[in-house]
């Protein structure tokens, strides 16, 4: 043990420790949806990891940007002194959109990036600047990249300007290099990174398979990869949001290949915190679904009525029971 301590002392690195001294507490950032918290962390009170990369992938119009902004809003609401750096590659985020989502404009920086090299450079500089601050002065911070699939490369731009009709074979390696540099630095700084990305159907696969674009760099760097699908949510004839199907394609924290449904409103309500808990309670046997109504305390109540007044039905005792069910359903080793 003395030898190991001498090695640690000789290296003189703040991030080199004897294993016994490592802080094993996993910290999470609440996403604003209990059921999404459960599928990515194994607890309805968890969320995305506070110092790892989380990838949110899906086809066009599955709500990746809306979903990311909903998580950002909840992060800023939960951390009144926190802030977020939003790397926008699609010029999709403007003041009107942010205001409609209820995001605090004073604590969000939108950074437009065109190339992988530009994102890598700006993100690394931001992390280094953050880590130069004394630990006690560091406020909670989150990074978002929306989206990886739209990033070009400097070579691709040069070839286009020179009218060269050639395919850029460097993009995959540049993505890998960017995440090799960022993954550990973000972990050391306790800064989470949410990356949105597009998916495509794998041609020739024996079973229908989807894969993320941009090569394997993000696939290896991300601790959690969530694939999204969606259907429209209507109030009468008006479309008021999406029902998002979220499936864990990869997770180092919770079980893989688990799927849940989340409700995302288009207005400033964002993610519905309680949507999906009725189905979770049904799995755990807390209540039964009989002809579209749930039996709770001897009464048969429609889901719409319960979700309209969640505090009445999701009491602290019920939430504790639901969390235990979530741990059994989604956590490793259960």
Regions found by a protein language model. Give the residues of each.
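A short alpha->loop->secondary-structure connector
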Residues: 101-108, 159-168, 210-215
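Short acidic-hydrophobic, aromatic-tinged amphipathic segments that line or gate anion-handling sites
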Residues: 108-114
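Phosphate-binding/switch loop-helix module in NTP-utilizing enzymes
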Residues: 114-190
